[in-house]
Amino acid sequence: MRLLHVTQSYYPFLAKGGPTVKVRSLARGLASSGNAVTVLTADLGFDRAKREISGAVPGRWGFEASENGVEAIYLRTRGRYRSLTWNPGVAAFCPERLDGFDLTHIYGLYDLIGPRVASACRRIARPYVVEPMGMFLPIVRNIWMKRLYHDTLGGRLLQGASRVIATSEQERLELLEGGIADSKIVVRRNGIEIPGQFPPAESFRNQWNIPRDAKFVLFLGRLVSKKSPDLMLEVFSQWNRRENGSRGSVLVMAGPDEGDGFRQHLEGLAAQMGLNGRVLFTGPLYGDAKWAAYRDADVFVLPSQNENFGNTAAEAVACGTPVLVTDRCGIAPMVDQRAGLVVPHDCAALEAGLAQILNDAALAARLREGCKGVANSLSWAEPLAQMETLYRELISERRGQ
């Protein structure tokens, strides 16, 4: 199959979060099984990309690269507002290249590339699928702009799709409530790529001077309001007070911010709560540094307002670390009472769950053991096979076979 994957952000721009990693994993997996895969995305910085991608070269529409059998085309960015980019090269790409693909997979909402490609697909009767990646519900920041997007570009994008991909039952219900037909929705979980070898135990603790006997709580993700890092601080503060300042306990807040001052706001909150020396803001962690943090933590917490899946929780589980997630995370049913605890999205419930995992050694040991079984069900093999089957079905429908 000749497949086009369209995404606002792609490797090596990892600061844009989990979608960047997910699209790369899917593209590489599909290419490894013999499909011709092209990724169309935005150029968010050629200088950085050429340092991290072997063979990245200037191209007609921006720059191009080939990695693990995947052709990546980074459209030149002519304007930008937050994560939204203007990439006029998509107008030339579509008439010249789109007819050469059997199917297009569009990731995410609230960008301008996906709707333009979808419109071109409809004109030439090419099937496309849309994977909202948890963006369907406008929850935080610029909500009125997101609603305007749905009323204009987003509505046509989704209604014209052959299928809409949800990564959890939670996201499927959100799509149904938003008017997407049940017959159009396909549920496909995410997978994770686990390194062949983890960093040595205690390497993260040693690097950041976290004592071996200290309770190490990990929050890892973008520092944005949707993921509730401010609530994480409040939960940790309350747990510390309840434990009378548990000796040496540390909260690591790892992840990029969006340059909007939110990290500074969080640092100020930590100081107001008297957590100086107890909270470490490490910035983003990638590669071995990320896996070392997961491995050394006593518990990983994902206190999000809404997560279509929760890749970071899955990665923590793969490292054998118990997780505490809210019931608004798509991964919750997979981990509940097996690899972690699931609680409502409020401070008291999260603090109680944190106390359970940190204070009950038998529970923590049971959850660590349970992580093994959950981790075995989180590879990309099944999701990739499901996508290939779906793609072939839609291509056959178009050809009338």
Task: Please annotate each region the language model reported.
Residues 4, 211-227, 233-236, 252:
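Conserved donor-binding/catalytic core segment of Leloir-type glycosyltransferases
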Residues 43, 170, 191:
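Carbohydrate-associated surface elements
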Residues 46, 192, 220, 248-267, ...:
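Glycosyltransferase donor-sugar binding loop
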Residues 53-61, 197-210, 241:
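A short helix/loop element that forms part of the nucleotide-sugar donor recognition site in Leloir-type
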Residues 127, 137-160:
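Nucleotide-sugar donor phosphate/pyrophosphate-binding loop at the beta->alpha transition
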Residues 305:
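Aromatic "clamp/platform" in nucleotide-sugar-dependent glycosyltransferases that forms part
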Residues 322-325:
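Short hydrophobic beta-strand element within catalytic cores of glycosyltransferases
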Residues 337, 341-348, 356-362:
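Conserved acidic donor-binding segment of nucleotide-sugar-dependent glycosyltransferases
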